[in-house]
C-alpha cells in the first residue's frame, strides 16, 4: 500500500502543476485512464487472499476518488482563471461615450394625418377606410358626378377598364358608410388617392382626408364652426378664415376655404359644402329628413402649409436630410 500512497502523491503533484485543462486531462489519463497507474492497481487484488481483497479494493477506490476530487477542483480553478482573464480583456470602459442608436421618426404626412384624426376623434368622428381600386359608381355616379364631367377623362383618372379605376377621392368611403349605417353619422376617411398629374404642387398619388356628418338639422353654420375650430387647432393659431362660393357636384351649396398666410395672402386649404340631396338619396337616406356636410383636404397640401415646404414632391423622395427635419 506504500506504493499506492506514492502514486497518489505523484498524481496530486502533477495535478497541481497542470497549467491548463489539456495538461490536466493528460494527468487524468495517466492515473485514472483505462491503463492508468491507479486503475491497474485493481489487478493486484488477485494476488491477495480472498478475505483481504474487499479491504484492499476499498483502499484503492478511496485513492482513485481522492485523485478524481483533486482533478475536479483543479479543472474548476483553471476554467475560472480562463474566464476571469477573458472578462478582464472584455471589460467595458463605462467612461467612453456610448454608440448612439438613432431613432426613427414619423413621416411629416403621417404626423398630419395623426393630428387630424386626433382632433376629429375628440369630436366623436370615427375613422373609416375603403378600397383604393374603386368602381365608377362609388367614385362618380353615387356622388352626383355626371358622365360628361372632366374628372372622368383619361387625362385626369387612371382607368383599368370601363368601370374600374384607381380612386380619385375617398368619397366612395362616405357612400359605403351611409349605406351601411343609419344617421347620425360622423366619419372621416383618410387614404391614398390617384390623379394623372405631376408638378411642383401635384403628384400622381397623394393622401386625402374627407369628413362627413349626416344628422337632422345640420346647417352650413355647423360646417363653418367645425372647420374654423379645426384650422385653429391644426395651425395652432387664431386663423383668419374665409369661405368662397364654389362648385362640387356632390355638395350644394359648396365652398372653398382659405386661410390668411403670414405673407398676407390667402391660401386655399380645403373644399366643403352641404351634402347634395341626390347623394343622400343614392345612399338610401331621406334628404327631407336628414342633412349633412362634407369636406375634403389634401394631406400633403396641409403639411406643406404647416411646415413651410415649397415642393410637394419632397415628401416622396425619401431624402433623409429632408425627413430628419421633422423628427
Swiss-Prot record:
GO (cellular component) term, any one: cytoplasm
InterPro entries, per the entry: aa-tRNA-synth_II, aa-tRNA-synth_II/BPL/LPL, Phe-tRNA-synth_IIc_asu, Phe-tRNA_ligase_II_N, Phe_tRNA_ligase_alpha1_bac, Phenylalanyl-tRNA_Synthase, tRNA-bd_arm
A GO MF term: magnesium ion binding
Domain of life (superkingdom): Bacteria
UniProt keyword Ribonucleoprotein present: no
EC assignment: 6.1.1.20
Cellular compartments annotated: Cytoplasm
Enzyme type, top EC level: ligase
Keyword S-adenosyl-L-methionine attributed: no
Cofactor(s) recorded in Swiss-Prot or TrEMBL: Mg(2+)
CDD domains: PheRS_alpha_core (cd00496)
UniProt keyword terms in alphabetical order: Aminoacyl-tRNA synthetase, ATP-binding, Cytoplasm, Ligase, Magnesium, Metal-binding, Nucleotide-binding, Protein biosynthesis
Cofactor binding summary note: Binds 2 magnesium ions per tetramer.
Subunit structure comment from the entry: Tetramer of two alpha and two beta subunits.
HAMAP family for this protein: Phe_tRNA_synth_alpha1
Identification of the protein by name: Phenylalanine--tRNA ligase alpha subunit
Protein source organism: Erwinia tasmaniensis (strain DSM 17950 / CFBP 7177 / CIP 109463 / NCPPB 4357 / Et1/99)
